[in-house]
Structures are given as structure tokens and as C-alpha cells.
Amino acid sequence: MKKIASFCSAAVLIASSFLLNNTVQAQQILDRVVVVVDDGVVLQSQIDQLIQQVKNGQNFNSSNAPSDEVLETQAIERLILQEIQLQMANRMGIEIDDNQLEQAINEIANNQDLTTAELRENMVSSGMSWAAYRENIRNELVIQQVQRAAVQQRVSITPQEINNLVKLIESNQEVQTEYRLAQILISADSNSSQAELEKAKERANTVLNLLDKGSDFADLAVRSSSGSAALDGGDLGWMTVNGMPTLFAEAVDGKSVGDVVGPIRSGIGFHILKVQDKRGEQTVEVQEVKARHILIKPSVILSDNKAKEMLNKYREQIASGEKTFAELAREHSADPGSASRGGDLGWARPNKYAPEFKQKVESIEQDTISEPFSTQFGWHIVEVTGRRTLDATEENKQERAYQMLFSRKFREELDNWQQEIRDQAFIRRVAE
């Protein structure tokens, strides 16, 4: 009987193994390489996931939703460009660590008035795993760094341009108006033949006619746009007149919310713009904190636990009146810049500090010493001794003018650069 039982058990194991292998093979078959991009690939699973994200995010009406073919084409184009830029990041040694990632995710949640837990729940309920969402955000942050590194060196701004814009800002309130624009780009670069240009312009006019008849701009952007924001419904976000490409600024001047303008010819094609929203200049207020801290740096002979114990001991000494915060900072703090001032960091905006330090000075009550916490610099205790609000509306007009000019020129150069790197890449579709 034992032999029979053993034989049955072995048979079950063999059958289970066979079924498992078949299941694994089936799962592997479900994913495949769709496009080879230089040294990398775009997988079918990536395309499917991006299409599902777009469907969940855009809330298309069933009557006018883009076909899966259209969504797949747009998804492939975005993923090709993403893969090219991620490979560039790898060659440049650009990485995003977990602390940077967590800070970015916290900011995303805050901007949506959500906790991180609520954001996670929303992602999971929409069908995306939290791990996949985190990886998407990490990739976006990496690509942003690649773009800054590659494109900012192509942007040139002269002192005269800055001075001229400062004068314009002071004399013309309109330049402070922000526009939220959406774009549909019909691609046609400077090397296109006359026939290709005419065909692209005809497509742009067809899109305009559809918009005149009431078609949804975001739906048409997903269907027709070659722009990098196509899968976001063409949304370009908020920008001032001087922060947008010159062609756009001239086109939207004096336009109202809901107005559609175009087609506008540029070096990369024909643009159709929609003014989604407008807002005027607002008073800018910034929060500053006056803080002091004691820093203990772990080393080969000083463990993290020991550093934490030392800081807890200092907290007890301060609470009992045995020592003052300033005395302990002068005696023990490893921050040479503040130790001689009793740990005083002066007035500063929280975003000046490391993410963990920023979070701590923003959250603790004034005149309260924090529990020990760590940053990339070591272990700290911190006390906020003051808070104030400053009117920064007129602060640093030169910097504001520079940023507006940089933003405008960066957007123009980014489109050109992305077209260039795509043209230079080896891209091959893989037959099914």
C-alpha cells in the first residue's frame, strides 16, 4: 500500500510539474518583443499596461473612444521614446534612489489631496500594481534628468533678454497670465517634401473640422497627435505667455477659455492648440522656518544605534535643564557650519533641506525637539524655533524672468531633441 501511495504521490507531482510548466510557458507566450530599440526592447505587456492606464485615466465615452489600434500605435511611440531615453540614462549613470522616489510619490499624493496609502489604493483598484506604479514614477524621474542634462545645454539666454523681460513684466500684467494648453501635433519635419507637407496640413484641417463639429479635443489628441503628451489628451499643463514657445504665445494672445487655434506651422509639424483654462497672477507667499539641529555622523566606530542613543541622551539633558541645546550643539554636532552657532540654521525655506529634514521641520510643533531621525548626512535632532510667511511676489525678478525664458526655450528644444534621438535610434518592429 505504501508503494502505491508513493507511486500516486509521484504521479501527482509529475502532473503538477507538467501543468506548472505549461502554465509558465503560456504566460511567457502571452508576452513578446514588439519593437527592438537599440540595445533594448518594447514588450507587449508594457504596451497593454500603458493602454489600460490611458483608458482608466481618460474615461473615454464608448461612442467615441479611440480604437485599440490607435491606442496601441500611440503607446508604442511613447514607449520607444521612453526606452531610448532610459538607455541614455543608463549610459550617463543617472539613477533615482528610493528616498527620491518616496519624496516624489508623496508630492504626487499631496497634490491630489490624498495620503500615500490612498494613492496606492487607487492605483491597485485601477488594475495597476503598486510596484509597477513606483517603477513608472522612477522612470519618469530618470527621463526628466536625462532631458535636463541633454536639452539645457542647447538653451542659450542672454542678459539682455532677461532685462527686457523684467521690464515687460513690470509694465504688462498680461504676461503674468497663465494658460493651460492642450495640443494636437500633426508631424511634418523640415525634411518633408512639399507633398508630405500638404498632406500633413490637410490632416490638421480635418482635425479642426472635427473639433468644429463638437469632437472631444482629448480624444482626438489620443487618436491623431504625434506630440509626447498625446496619451494625456494633449495636455501641456500650465505656462505663462513667456514660458511657452513663441509660436504658441502669438497664437493664444487674447484668446478665451475653450478657444481652439491653428494649424500653426513649426519645424516639426502643424500644431492645433486649445486654451483649456486661464488664471491671473497671484500673490506668492512662502513659508520659512528658523531651526537648529545637532548632527551625529555614524562611522566605522560609531554605529547607527549608538548615534541614536547619543541624541536621545542629549534630548533628556535638554529636557532636564542639565544642558542647553546650543551648548550640546557646540560640543557635539558634526555640522561645522552650524555647530559654532549653537546648531542655528537661520531662516530658510523647508525645501532647501534633505527630504527627511524638510518633512520633520514642516511637521513638528514649534519649540519642540524632534525624536532622532536619519538623513543622508547622518542622525539629527531638530527644533523649530520660529515660523514666518513672506510675500515673495516681487522677489528676484531676474530669476523669474530667467525661468520663464528657460521654460519657453526648453520646450522648443525638447521637441526637436526628441525627434533627433528617435531618428538616430535603431528601431525595428518584430513580426508576430
UniProtKB/Swiss-Prot annotation:
Q: Name one GO molecular function term.
A: peptidyl-prolyl cis-trans isomerase activity
- UniProt keyword Transmembrane helix, yes or no: no
**Where does the record locate the signal sequence feature?**
1-26
Segments forming domain PpiC: 176-277, 286-386
Protein name stated in the entry = Chaperone SurA
Q: Where in the cell is it found?
A: Periplasm
Could you list this entry's UniProt keywords, alphabetically sorted: Chaperone, Isomerase, Periplasm, Repeat, Rotamase, Signal
Q: What is its main location?
A: periplasm
Per the record, its GO cellular-component terms are:
outer membrane-bounded periplasmic space
The domain-related comment in the record is: The PPIase activity resides only in the second parvulin domain. The N-terminal region and the C-terminal tail are necessary and sufficient for the chaperone activity of SurA. The PPIase activity is dispensable for SurA to function as a chaperone. The N-terminal region and the C-terminal tail are also required for porin recognition.
Q: Which PANTHER family match?
A: CHAPERONE SURA (PTHR47637:SF1)
**InterPro entries hit by this protein:** OMP_Chaperone_SurA, PPIase_dom_sf, PPIase_PpiC, PPIase_PpiC_CS, PPIase_SurA, SurA_N, Trigger_fact/SurA_dom_sf
Q: What Pfam families does the record point to?
A: Rotamase (PF00639), Rotamase_3 (PF13616), SurA_N (PF09312)
What is the species listed in this Swiss-Prot or TrEMBL entry? Idiomarina loihiensis (strain ATCC BAA-735 / DSM 15497 / L2-TR)
Is Isomerase given among the entry's keywords?
A: yes
